[in-house]
Amino acid sequence: LRGRYVSNVYDEGLSDQEILVHIGLDDIDSHFGGCTTHLSYLIVKELLKTLNVEFIDYPNLVRLNPSIPFKTRGNGAVALRLKTFRSNIKLLVKTLTDMTLKYLSEYEVSVGSDPGIALVFGDVPKELSKLYMKALTDYVHRDYLLNILNKLDNIETPLGISRGVIGALAAIGWPQGSDCTYELLAYRVLRGVGERCVDKDSVKNADLKYSEYIFNNYDHEEDVLLITPHSNDPV
């Protein structure tokens, strides 16, 4: 399905006005490589370098229903929230789109994935909060998404209306200020992809020492390292 375009955001007569922008990304990975959080990191880095933007929150890594059969790994989508001037929107959308397409090609994200990006301009509509809850606890049919898109006029989907747009908009709909945890992610370059060199004992000792603050790093009963991913993604 063709993407949606929000024409009034590009009104040149309002170019000096600030606007709130929420960016959602999902399904930017496959069993062979890529990672939605990694692309999000690259986008944040590029926007800070080339555009006059002010992020209003940390990137939100939003976990959705883990039982969905379409998931590639952990079924997590990302929302980025920022303020910028309307005059920057055209370049922002182009940068976001170009970087996503380049990433999909570079990391061969195709088989089993249906990548989606979405932008919400202004306040987050209550319909997206409902979408988040449904995506967390249930299965979201594409018709449900289309009903939302037909109601709202502040959502743009530059890559089309893919399955990934469901997760992207659900991440945007996550209620800001809710209880959360924090993840510290480290990424490797493509030439470093292979077996991860992580010292098992160091993770085990750190997990014991800081058990009051961290979790799911090590399975002490099975003596198994949990902190490292098992796929070819850049994490």
Model regions and ranges:
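Conserved mixed alpha/beta catalytic, RNA-binding, or beta-rich assembly cores of soluble enzyme
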Residues: 1-235
